């Protein structure tokens, strides 16, 4: 069998509201995922064992890596004895809140389900994905905007794309999601806005006023401890973004722009200071 190569795209969060904490310690949330044009490249080759290599030497390639965990979880589910050599060309910054590791894991499930002739159902793959992480189901099942709730297991593809251009900045800090959940300023007693309805107004009527309720609950604690992240958000606004926010638990931030030309110009200017990536309006994962 020949090798298979794929791209694994990153995401941003339009709003990230932490709604509670379960008895098992997991936090529940509501968010809207949107894809961006920042991707890793993965190559899957037949092998006797499950193993991995990566262009970024700071990333482990052992059982703690989500790709390895995804491959072994699928193998355990199916009972196959096949192996795979995974080659990861890492471009999405890690510890940035862009879901790079989750996207890589979703690509691993999708490719190996075919390569190993498992033909697991979408329901079975969803269960495996939920066990790997809150963002993994999104990358497995959606190409555009999607609403997620619970611990990520409640996922609804909104069948929409964002009609605005995006500039994403990585300030350089690597922020642990575990740290962010331990330290964010909890406020569970509040009314949660209808993110699904509001994002439809945003996309279908270009009603940008709805964005005022698209808060990210990690922003206050991240900005307090990582001032460079706040500065990056401010830089986006100064460059013409009409809405800017932290993505996930950071440290990446993103800004929305009215058109591609303004966004491209801002990305080029900001690339002198940050790792910057432009995403055109109405982008969807291939």
UniProtKB/Swiss-Prot annotation:
* Chain positions recorded as ATP binding sites: 93-103
Q: Which SUPFAM superfamilies match?
A: GHMP Kinase, C-terminal domain, Ribosomal protein S5 domain 2-like
Q: Which reaction does it catalyse?
A: 4-CDP-2-C-methyl-D-erythritol + ATP = 4-CDP-2-C-methyl-D-erythritol 2-phosphate + ADP + H(+)
> Which keywords describe this protein according to UniProt?
ATP-binding, Isoprene biosynthesis, Kinase, Nucleotide-binding, Transferase
* Pfam families the UniProt entry points to: GHMP_kinases_C, GHMP_kinases_N
Any GO BP annotation: terpenoid biosynthetic process
- Principal EC category: transferase
Give the matching InterPro entries.
Answer: GHMP_kinase_C_dom, GHMP_kinase_C_sf, GHMP_kinase_N_dom, IspE, Ribosomal_Su5_D2-typ_SF, Ribsml_uS5_D2-typ_fold_subgr
Q: Which residues form the active site?
A: 11, 135
Cite the EC number: 2.7.1.148
Name the pathway it acts in: Isoprenoid biosynthesis; isopentenyl diphosphate biosynthesis via DXP pathway; isopentenyl diphosphate from 1-deoxy-D-xylulose 5-phosphate: step 3/6
Question: Which residues are in coiled coils?
Answer: none
Protein task: Catalyzes the phosphorylation of the position 2 hydroxy group of 4-diphosphocytidyl-2C-methyl-D-erythritol.
The record's comment on protein family reads: Belongs to the GHMP kinase family. IspE subfamily.
Q: What is this protein called?
A: 4-diphosphocytidyl-2-C-methyl-D-erythritol kinase
Q: Which organism is it from?
A: Prosthecochloris aestuarii (strain DSM 271 / SK 413)
Specify the taxonomic lineage.
Bacteria, Pseudomonadati, Chlorobiota, Chlorobiia, Chlorobiales
């Amino acid at each position: 069998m020949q090798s298979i190569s794929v791209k694994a795209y990153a995401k941003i969060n339009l709003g990230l509201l932490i709604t509670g904490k379960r008895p098992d310690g997991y936090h529940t949330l509501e968010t809207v995922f949107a894809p961006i044009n920042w991707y890793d490249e993965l190559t899957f080759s037949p092998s006797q064992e499950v193993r991995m290599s990566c262009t970024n030497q700071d990333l482990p390639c052992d059982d703690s890596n989500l790709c390895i965990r995804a491959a072994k979880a699928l193998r355990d589910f199916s009972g196959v004895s096949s192996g795979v050599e995974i080659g990861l060309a890492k471009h999405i910054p890690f510890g940035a809140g862009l879901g790079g590791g989750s996207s890589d894991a979703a690509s691993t499930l999708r490719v190996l389900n075919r390569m190993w002739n498992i033909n697991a159902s979408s329901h079975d793959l969803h269960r495996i994905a939920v066990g790997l992480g809150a963002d993994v189901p999104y990358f497995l099942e959606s190409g555009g905007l999607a609403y997620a709730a619970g611990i990520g297991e409640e996922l609804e593809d909104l069948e929409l794309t964002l009609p605005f251009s995006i500039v994403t900045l990585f300030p350089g800090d690597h922020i642990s999601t575990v740290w962010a959940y331990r330290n964010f300023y909890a406020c569970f007693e509040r009314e949660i806005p209808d993110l699904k309805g509001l994002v439809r107004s945003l996309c279908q009527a270009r009603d940008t006023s709805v964005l005022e309720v698209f808060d990210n609950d990690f922003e206050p604690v991240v900005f307090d401890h990582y001032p460079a992240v706040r500065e990056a958000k401010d830089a986006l606004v100064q460059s013409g973004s009409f809405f800017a926010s932290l993505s996930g638990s950071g440290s990446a931030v993103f800004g929305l722009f009215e058109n591609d030309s303004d966004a491209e110009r801002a990305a080029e200017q900001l690339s002198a200071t940050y790792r910057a990536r432009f995403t055109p309006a109405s982008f969807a994962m291939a």
